[in-house]
Design a protein with these regions (language model features):
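Helix N-cap at the start of a conserved alpha-helix in ABC-type nucleotide-binding domains
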Residues: 169-171
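Helix-to-loop junction immediately C-terminal to a conserved catalytic motif
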Residues: 48
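Conserved ABC ATPase "signature" region
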Residues: 63-64, 100, 104, 111-128
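ABC ATPase NBD coupling module
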Residues: 65-81, 105, 110-111, 227-228
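Short coil-to-helix segment of the ABC ATPase nucleotide-binding domain corresponding to the Q-loop/switch region
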Residues: 93-100
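Conserved signature/switch motifs of ABC ATPase nucleotide-binding domains
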Residues: 132-135, 152-154
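ABC ATPase "signature
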Residues: 218-219, 227
Length: 335
């Protein structure tokens, strides 16, 4: 478990982190999302004490990292792997030798090194690339080497600082799937730092949203997708196809449909793929038009948002329509 308690980080009088408290459970994949400058990378570096907090407690696996001696901190850091946007591979070393590097620093016997490295290369899909050099690899393959190097020491925690932001969309999908597999097979707790909501949706079960050095909202991905409260969160939960925030899309729809009612319907899990709107429409006499819709896959199954326009009808019919939707686990928001 990772517990951050009242973390503050001050640089030359500037509060980069402001009274942050967050708990990440064992085996969880937790996303920390925010725009550039929000403080998320500073926060993740506090976890392994690459950036010691100005004040507050960082408790990892029951040990307060802030109070450890230098020797104790070195030992605890071995239990925390980290991957970055830039791969930081040694160009003169092969894939095998790059992965071996942290084991060499820890004086792990050669026989044990070989067994561990071979197992990890198999896990990350690079068994046939062990003798290749970084210059011979694609970006996705280089990141797989970085992941292998980060987990070869059997850490309990893996920190990912924008590890997919420099990759193309298809490679991002494969890297996220690899991280999910690692989490499932090895039970490693993963902390994902990202500015991409799609990354959080695909892999995380919980998320925290950062802005100006603070956590402004946190909860399950499902909760924050269905009920984004803070303005920053609502900006992230955007309609991908229209490339607009919720507020921008709502305003454009209101101008297009000045009369009648506009509803935002949020679906998750099985009901995202059910004909719920069609079934509800059969109960009422008024016209219903789907004016915008998007369904995407997430770590908790499909998630969808549909905007509908209702023309005419009386209140009792409208209430019947909304009641049917809510009874079938659809979140209804009137625009």
């Amino acid at each position: 478990m990772i517990e951050l308690k009242h973390i503050n980080k001050i640089y030359n009088g500037f509060n980069a982190l402001n009274d942050i408290s967050l708990t990440i459970k064992d085996g969880e994949i937790c996303g920390i999302i925010g725009q550039s400058g929000a403080g998320k990378s500073t926060l993740v570096r506090c976890i392994n004490m690459l950036e010691p907090p100005t004040s507050g407690d960082v408790i990892v696996n029951g040990r307060n990292m802030v109070t450890l001696s230098k020797r104790e901190l070195r030992e605890e850091r071995k239990k925390i792997g980290m991957i970055f946007q830039h791969f930081n591979l040694l160009s003169s070393r092969t894939v095998y030798e790059n992965v071996a590097f942290p084991l060499e620093l820890s004086n792990v016997p050669q026989g044990e090194q070989k067994e561990r490295i071979n197992d990890i290369l198999e896990l990350v899909g690079l068994a046939d690339y062990r003798n290749k050099y970084p210059a011979q690899l694609s970006g996705g393959q280089k990141q797989r080497v970085g992941i292998a190097r980060a987990i070869v020491s059997n850490p309990s925690v893996l920190l990912s600082d924008e590890a997919t932001s420099a990759l193309d969309p298809e490679t991002v999908k494969s890297i996220l799937q690899l991280l999910k597999d690692i989490n499932k097979k090895l039970g490693i707790t993963i902390v994902m730092i990202t500015h991409q909501m799609e990354v959080v949706q695909k892999i995380c079960t919980r998320m925290a949203v950062m802005s100006d050095g603070k956590i402004v909202e946190e909860g399950t991905v499902k909760q924050l997708f269905e009920h984004p409260k803070h303005t920053v969160t609502r900006r992230f939960v955007q309609n991908v196809e229209a490339n607009q925030t919720i507020e921008e899309l709502a305003e454009s729809l209101k101008k297009k449909y000045p009369s009648g009612k506009l509803l935002r319907l949020s679906f998750t899990g099985n009901n995202a793929e059910q004909p719920t709107i069609i079934n509800a429409a059969r109960l009422v006499p008024f016209e219903i038009s789907i004016v915008e819709s998007n369904i995407s896959q997430s770590s908790v199954g499909p998630m969808g948002v549909t905007y509908i326009h209702i023309s005419g009808g009386i209140d009792s019919d409208y209430n019947k329509f909304v009641t049917y939707l809510t009874d079938n686990n659809v979140i209804v928001e009137v625009l």
